[in-house]
Amino acid sequence: MAAVKTLNPKAEVARAQAALAVNISAARGLQDVLRTNLGPKGTMKMLVSGAGDIKLTKDGNVLLHEMQIQHPTASLIAKVATAQDDITGDGTTSNVLIIGELLKQADLYISEGLHPRIITEGFEAAKEKALQFLEQVKVSKEMDRETLIDVARTSLRTKVHAELADVLTEAVVDSILAIRKKDEPIDLFMVEIMEMKHKSETDTSLIRGLVLDHGARHPDMKKRVENAYILTCNVSLEYEKTEVNSGFFYKSAEEREKLVKAERKFIEDRVKKIIELKKKVCGDSDKGFVVINQKGIDPFSLDALAKEGIVALRRAKRRNMERLTLACGGIALNSFDDLNPDCLGHAGLVYEYTLGEEKFTFIEKCNNPRSVTLLVKGPNKHTLTQIKDAIRDGLRAVKNAIDDGCVVPGAGAVEVALAEALIKYKPSVKGRAQLGVQAFADALLIIPKVLAQNSGFDLQETLVKVQAEHSESGQLVGVDLSTGEPMVAAEMGVWDNYCVKKQLLHSCTVIATNILLVDEIMRAGMSSLKG
């Protein structure tokens, strides 16, 4: 009888074999759900929420976030996989598959009486060897546009259909190349993702500038300005109450008039400064002048600015202030005391676009923009969400490739090569831990197997072909998903991120090891004692 039972008769306990069976069945269950959506030929899942909202996706991360998982072990695996996405942006489905398969392979040996500790020692040895081998097969190369496009395409094709993936690939790579500075880390926040419910998803495009999701607030302001100076500021151009609660007493109407005038004058002086600057830089030329303010602009000020032909946008989002100065140049001002032409940015074209009730302001044709916008278009909400998730992963894939300075061949090529290397390494491991290494090698093959299966080919036949080709040629050979034949992944431009594979080997081994070593599950928390 479990010791915990004597202390708490209501506790639920699962011992040794039962505990392991519970955990392994959870891992298998999760693996079966995600198995079919691995790779570019994977199938979609439809998630229907309690409110009846529909989400169509084959992104493992989105699925694991949205699915309500009751089983504690399964939710542990799901958390590991979503953490993988947070760190590297890819590899969630592979993560779940490999953990499930490691446990499945281990189960075969444990059912024959092998102790889990011995298998986990084998797993550790295999992981160390696999990481060494990964160092050998990684391909260090110049991260030019072609390579980055291959990396992004490999990632994006697993999230959305091929035609859309090709459109997004170019946009994603060009956006990263635009914001990239030498010897500085890439800041993905400098790529704004703006959505428009409009046209079809293949109209998604890269705007080399900014798109703001609001328009000018005055009917007389121009809807299109070419060759414009841009003043970015965070200065209030409306009457604001004083910070302390103060009251003014006046004896006559004249005094009240004076008070109102004094209050207005404060704002009018600021507006005059903008107008003077505009006259100074534009003169009589037809150059435009645009003010983008983070705070409010009241109707009087808008009117004064409109008369001078200045376009003014108020209440711009804070995150866009930094992006504006990076895209157009200039300096964001917090006061107008030292207002001079050096503070101004420049854009070749600023125009307003109205879509139903919504207005968008496009700031384009900037010289050498350091911040860009990906304009996501799609006919409905769930298409937009799907594209946004895909773009985020695509951006991360390109960033990882640049940060790593190297890539590894995809299409299951690395897994096949790793499995073969581990089988060769197996005899040098002492004792029964060899079985753990064998289990690890077999588990890695789940990736090429499932890739082939999802494409409609026989998984054993395809795997045998690929392994034979790998042994003969010595090259890293993956599965060609359109024919089911072996192919040299590097020649076809199928590349995966090195850091994703490295993270996969680490996290899968750690979690599988921990789950195998569980020999007792107790549900004896405070909540289960009530009743």
Swiss-Prot record:
Entry EC no(s): 3.6.1.-
Please cite one Gene Ontology biological process associated with this protein. binding of sperm to zona pellucida
Question: Where does the record put the Glycyl lysine isopeptide (Lys-Gly) (interchain with G-Cter in SUMO2) cross-link?
Answer: 251
Which positions in this protein are listed as binding ADP? 39, 91-94, 158-159, 411, 496
In this chain, Mg(2+) is annotated as bound at 90
User: Any idea where this protein resides?
Assistant: Cytoplasm
What's in the GO CC field?
Answer: acrosomal vesicle; cell body; chaperonin-containing T-complex; zona pellucida receptor complex
Q: List N-acetylalanine occurrences by residue.
A: 2
PTM: The N-terminus is blocked.
Q: Which GO terms describe its molecular function?
A: ATP binding; ATP hydrolysis activity; ATP-dependent protein folding chaperone; unfolded protein binding
List positions binding ATP. 39, 91-93, 411-412, 496, 501
UniProt entry tagged with the keyword Metal-binding: yes
| Cysteine pairs bridged by disulfides in the record | none
Q: Which residues carry this modification: Phosphoserine?
A: 205
As stated in the Swiss-Prot or TrEMBL entry, residues carrying the post-translational modification N6-acetyllysine are 5, 199, 287, 365, 377, 388
Distribution of this protein across tissues and organs? Expressed in all tissues examined.
Tell me which SUPFAM superfamilies the record gives. Answer: GroEL apical domain-like, GroEL equatorial domain-like, GroEL-intermediate domain like
The protein's enzyme class: hydrolase
Q: Does the keyword Transmembrane apply?
A: no
Q: How does it assemble?
A: Component of the chaperonin-containing T-complex (TRiC), a hexadecamer composed of two identical back-to-back stacked rings enclosing a protein folding chamber. Each ring is made up of eight different subunits: TCP1/CCT1, CCT2, CCT3, CCT4, CCT5, CCT6A/CCT6, CCT7, CCT8. Interacts with PACRG.
Sequence similarity: Belongs to the TCP-1 chaperonin family.
Q: What does this protein do?
A: Component of the chaperonin-containing T-complex (TRiC), a molecular chaperone complex that assists the folding of actin, tubulin and other proteins upon ATP hydrolysis. The TRiC complex mediates the folding of WRAP53/TCAB1, thereby regulating telomere maintenance.
Task: Return the protein name.
Answer: T-complex protein 1 subunit zeta
Q: Which organism is it from?
A: Mus musculus (Mouse)
User: What are the top taxonomic ranks of the organism?
Assistant: Eukaryota, Metazoa, Chordata, Craniata, Vertebrata
